[in-house]
Design a protein with these regions (language model features):
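Walker A (P-loop) phosphate-binding loop of P-loop NTPases
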Residues: 18
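Conserved lysine of the Walker
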Residues: 21-22
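Phosphate-binding/switch region of NTP-binding enzymes
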Residues: 141-221
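The Walker A (P-loop) glycine that initiates the GxxxxGKT/S ATP-binding motif of P-loop NTPases
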Residues: 14-15
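Phosphate-binding P-loop
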Residues: 1-8
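Helical hairpin unit composed of two closely spaced alpha helices linked by a short loop
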Residues: 41, 45, 112, 120-163
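Hydrophobic positions in the central parallel beta-sheet of the AAA+
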Residues: 11, 94, 123-125
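Cytosolic-facing regulatory segments adjacent to core modules
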Residues: 25-27, 31-119, 133
Length: 221
């Protein structure tokens, strides 16, 4: 639909919690890290690095996440885990799970990684509204400033940036729950800064109870 990821682009991927945006973007990051040998920087403000790595291992090896969490893997899953670990170890994926990170820190770390590793192929931020502001502005002003800075970072480093975003609870009050631009939480100028705004939506999310595993729920990442 988008003809792939392009340099300089800021892509906003928005969804309600539990729909699967983290799993979706991790799949993109894994494919780029493995298939193109490009460097991928992931700034995870919601989940720790260990949890993200476990999600990627489960996806890579078709392993039940509950089995991995409890250490009760089936024999075939142990073999798959070994293969998945070998595959992911070759991917140039760098995860930063610093809590309360500010945009200036993200920019500095990306510049350093690009310089030390001869470029970056993708930057992922999970998620936009958790980046700390630098002043006393209200949250809409903070998020607007952050989206502008993410776009500037994409242009400066000539790299696609995918920033995940939460949707406001207002979408739950409508009969038609398909998200629209105004549903992006503290959106401000996001739609002006982003080259692409994409939404993840599943009908079954509203038919079934969301999973209890946090952002994406379920037994598989």
């Amino acid at each position: 639909i988008t003809a792939g990821l392009h340099e300089d682009e800021l892509i906003i991927l928005a969804a309600r919690p539990g729909v699967g945006k983290t799993a979706f973007v991790l799949n993109i990051a894994q494919n780029i890290g493995k298939m193109t040998n490009e460097n991928v920087a992931i700034f995870s403000l919601e989940m720790g690095a260990e949890q993200l790595v476990n999600r990627m291992l489960c996806a890579e090896g078709s392993i039940d996440a509950n089995h991995l969490r409890t250490g009760q893997l089936e024999e075939s899953e142990w073999q798959n885990l070994i293969i998945a670990m070998g595959s992911l170890s070759k991917a140039n994926i760098y995860i930063d799970d610093t809590p309360g990170v500010k945009m200036a820190e993200i920019r500095a770390k990306c510049r350093r990684l690009a310089k030390e590793k001869d470029g970056i192929g993708l930057i992922v931020v999970d998620y936009l509204q958790l980046i700390e502001g630098s002043g006393q502005e209200n949250r809409q002003q903070v998020v607007s400033a952050i989206s502008r800075q993410l776009k500037k970072l994409a242009k400066e480093l000539r790299v696609p940036v995918i920033a995940l975003s939460q949707l406001s609870r207002g979408v739950e009050q409508r009969q038609d729950k398909r998200p629209v631009l105004s549903d992006i939480r503290e959106s401000g100028s996001i739609e002006q800064d982003a080259d692409i705004v994409a939404f993840l939506y599943r009908d079954d999310y509203y038919r079934d109870e969301p999973g209890e595993d946090g952002e994406d729920g379920g037994s598989q990442p």
